[in-house]
Amino acid sequence: MGRFSEDSADEPDEREMSAALTVGEGDIDASLRPRSLGEFIGQPRVREQLQLVLEGAKNRGGTPDHILLSGPPGLGKTSLAMIIAAELGSSLRVTSGPALERAGDLAAMLSNLVEHDVLFIDEIHRIARPAEEMLYLAMEDFRVDVVVGKGPGATSIPLEVAPFTLVGATTRSGALTGPLRDRFGFTAHMDFYEPSELERVLARSAGILGIELGAEAGAEIARRSRGTPRIANRLLRRVRDYAEVRADGVITRDIAKYALEVYDVDELGLDRLDRAVLSALTRSFGGGPVGVSTLAVAVGEEATTVEEVCEPFLVRAGMIARTPRGRVATAQAWTHLGMKPPANAVGLGQTGLFD
């Protein structure tokens, strides 16, 4: 694939059920990455669209339009960026939005690109404004204006940039400014995985890692993985530890269930903190409504952790509803905790994500 440079600012997260990379997980995660669109599991619509974009560019002998990959963490945006470069036979340069604090940081990176290179900017919604404004011109006209000097004597020197393809990844497409978003010729929206797709991901990972994984065990892990391949692979490694230490190393369905109970991952993929949030919401606040800051204090966590890590899955799973007055526990949340929902519980008589 040629040159590879990484300057990513992934912030480690220690929770088993967080879709963010954990400390020391990067190398393992990289070993499991697919190397081509053919190896990439899931996201069939995105794969088809990308194949057309890339094949069209190769047939013309040019560079593809700039590509934006949008979706929750852990779904394979970084893997797709690497695949894009590999499919084009191009070199890949990797950085992240938070790492580009000044326009000069970006100018230095752009000036080192050669024709047909792929520049991947992770968390592109967090790029500093001066760097973002420089990126506009680079994306459109393949040049940048570098300001030399200060004050009235400052001069702008135009520098040519080799034709390249920018691949941006974001978990918050709404946080992108309009001018930046409009400069991407193609946007891929990535969705959570179906359990059957995660079973295929797990089977592939087990083969690479030399793990003996039964089909029923794979299904058990998949349905607790929040629709996220990164979480599925992490749970696979934790279950492997359990199987090797407390059994014969073979992962059966029962072994998977016992292991996930040890790691506090329940049958719906909720972990200790998720259940603590639901417990506080139902037992301490009568089901709500309650503000996220108050809820965070009740469980001893930062409000941003509850809002950005726990809440999205709990809302998607039908456990919590957002209202103008605050968060409310649904009937499914009460039932999941083994309690009878009140008569006025949100969603009473309706089915949730896992029903």
UniProtKB/Swiss-Prot annotation:
Residues 194-264 are annotated as: Small ATPAse domain (RuvB-S). One of its GO terms (molecular function) is ATP binding. The keyword Lipid metabolism does not apply. DNA binds at residues 322, 327. It is found in: Cytoplasm. GO terms for cellular component: cytoplasm; Holliday junction resolvase complex. Its EC number is 3.6.4.-. It comes from the Bacteria. Residues 1-193 are annotated as: Large ATPase domain (RuvB-L). The RuvA-RuvB-RuvC complex processes Holliday junction (HJ) DNA during genetic recombination and DNA repair, while the RuvA-RuvB complex plays an important role in the rescue of blocked DNA replication forks via replication fork reversal (RFR). RuvA specifically binds to HJ cruciform DNA, conferring on it an open structure. The RuvB hexamer acts as an ATP-dependent pump, pulling dsDNA into and through the RuvAB complex. RuvB forms 2 homohexamers on either side of HJ DNA bound by 1 or 2 RuvA tetramers; 4 subunits per hexamer contact DNA at a time. Belongs to the RuvB family. HAMAP family: DNA_HJ_migration_RuvB. This is Holliday junction branch migration complex subunit RuvB.
